[in-house]
A protein has these predicted regions:
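Short, solvent-exposed loop/beta-turn-alpha elements that line the ligand-binding surface or hinge
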Residues: 114-129, 188-190, 194-202, 219-241, ...
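Conserved N-terminal structural module of periplasmic/extracytoplasmic solute-binding proteins
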Residues: 10-14, 25-26, 30-109, 118-125, ...
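Extracytoplasmic ligand-binding clamshell segments of periplasmic binding protein
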Residues: 75-78, 220-305, 443
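Hinge/lid segment of periplasmic solute-binding proteins
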Residues: 98-153, 314-320
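Helix-loop-helix "hinge/cap" segment bordering the ligand-binding cleft or interdomain interface
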Residues: 62, 66, 118, 138-209, ...
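Short helices/loops that flank or line small-molecule/ion binding pockets
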Residues: 78-89, 107, 161-162, 178-186, ...
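Long, aromatic- and glycine/proline-rich binding clefts that accommodate carbohydrate-like moieties
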Residues: 314-315, 320-321, 373-427, 431
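Extracytoplasmic/periplasmic substrate-recognition and gating elements
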Residues: 62, 141, 165, 303-378
């Protein structure tokens, strides 16, 4: 993705490095004595999240006498990867988000886990983790990671504004989304946009309109069955981008795309702040939008990130799955984009047996998952009901429904470096909506070639 900014809870973005680690690992072989059995774990967590993480690590130590786990927090993904490749990284490291999985797996920085999962001390991942979490831990057909907590992207609707316009439920299809937006959008006397129904516009808010969300709406595939980039071969990409352009023309330009594009550009430039009560969704400047699960508490209380049973914001809102192309409503409606944090075992680890024990225990610790979910509203990757709060606000329930939906997913991940395919697709979307890309099919074909070249170069 382009324009990544440091977010309070975002899994896809890197955390700042606030601690430096010197020296090499104190790692022993699997046959070492109990006194020298040490596993080192690096994670990006800080503050209360690090406290929860370290509590889980203490539980693993207590269950494995003689095992010492050295936990280091505030280490971002880039530093972990650099240290692993330099030969002085940890036994285990945590990566915040699927987009970086190809980076760690494709480069060989994380070891393959297949033999460990099916061994004596193995793990039945299908019975342990959600479907989206399982899929997210595989890169280029290789499983090199176990998933942690989820980050969920759903569709937010201003319930009051929809009701005033005569709509009782959020839009389920892309056709309904356009119809809703036409009725909800209003203009000032000078012709500028006063209230926007929905903005299919890259660069609005950080996690509002994203090319990944657009692809999810139309069921578009990032990669073909043969492993090549699917942007050209899968016609649903061209269909999705064409829908975006027609939407802008129809809702905002009175049939004129150039007019609608210019009006949206001005509207976006005047948006309110992202982190507080001036956010456009909170002021009623926009009626419907995509966003992350952790934005829900802010929309609910204004400027308080804590989960509240009852919302105190100006408008009542609802969360649902993404609107989808009409032919997909039966199978895909109710789904969204679900990402995961990941953790893997470094290629330089000499203590594979104990590292696997720690990795498996941390990934399946229901107490940690419950504490994390309760504190952050981030649904666990685990299927176990013990890994999620026994009670959470009714307004937040749709987030869990999205996680459970079989069509919820993150796109297939390959080694493109720091998720370059996402950045390239987002750049294309920005160029397309600005009218700078005249032929979307040709542009998508060029994009597929670039991504194939990047993948080939990195493998």
């Amino acid at each position: 993705m382009t324009g990544e900014i440091m977010q309070k809870k975002r899994l896809f973005a890197s955390f700042a490095v606030t601690a430096l680690v010197a020296g090499s690992l104190v790692a022993a072989s699997s046959v070492a004595t109990a006194a020298t059995r040490t596993v080192t774990v690096w994670a990006p967590y800080s503050g209360n999240n690090l406290v929860m993480w370290n509590a889980a690590i203490k539980r693993v130590e207590a269950a494995n006498p003689g095992l010492n786990i050295e936990s280091v927090g505030s280490i971002d993904m880039a530093k972990s990867l650099a240290a692993i490749n330099a030969g002085n990284g940890p036994d285990i490291s945590v990566s915040n988000g699927n987009g970086n999985l190809g980076w760690f797996c494709g480069s060989g920085a994380w070891q393959r886990l297949n033999s460990l999962m099916f061994g004596k001390n193995g793990l039945d991942v299908k019975k342990t983790f959600t479907a989206s979490a399982n899929a997210s831990a595989i890169s280029n057909g290789n499983r090199c990671a176990l998933p942690l907590g989820s980050e969920v992207f759903g569709f937010y609707s201003n319930k009051d504004m929809l009701a005033a316009a005569g709509f009782k439920t959020p839009p389920k299809t892309t056709t309904e989304l356009l119809a809703y937006s036409k009725k909800l959008t209003t203009f000032n006397s000078d012709g500028s946009i006063k209230v926007a129904g929905f903005l299919p516009w890259a660069g609005y808010y950080g996690f509002d309109m994203d090319s990944m969300w657009l692809g999810q709406m139309f069921g578009a595939r990032w990669y073909n069955a043969d492993g090549s980039a699917g942007f050209s071969k899968d016609v649903r990409w061209a269909k999705a981008f064409t829908w975006q352009k027609n939407f802008i023309a129809s809702v905002y330009g009175d049939g004129d795309f150039e007019k609608g594009s210019k009006l949206l550009l001005k509207f976006v430039a005047a948006k309110g702040g992202e982190w507080g009560t001036e956010h456009d969704f909170m002021t009623g400047r926009v009626a419907m939008k995509w966003d992350a699960n952790w934005m829900g508490p802010m929309f609910c209380t204004g400027d308080d990130w804590a989960m509240a049973d009852k919302c105190t914001a100006k408008y009542e809102f609802t969360i649902s799955g993404f609107p989808v192309s009409p032919e997909l409503v039966g199978s895909n409606y109710g789904s969204g984009v679900v990402g995961q944090a990941q953790m893997g075992i470094s290629k330089g680890s000499n203590n594979l047996r104990d590292s696997w024990t720690v990795l498996k225990a941390l990934a399946t610790d229901t107490k940690f998952a419950l504490a994390w979910d309760t504190a952050n509203g981030a649904p666990s990757s685990l299927l176990s009901k013990d890994a999620r709060p026994a009670k959470y606000p009714d307004w937040y329930q749709p987030i869990y429904d999205i996680v459970a939906h079989p069509a919820s997913a993150y796109h297939i991940v390959k080694n493109t470096g720091e998720h370059q395919e996402e950045a390239l697709l987002q750049n294309l979307m920005a160029s397309w909506q600005a009218g700078d890309t005249p032929n979307i099919k040709s542009a998508l074909a060029d994009l597929a070639i670039k991504v194939n070249q990047i993948v080939a170069r990195n493998n």
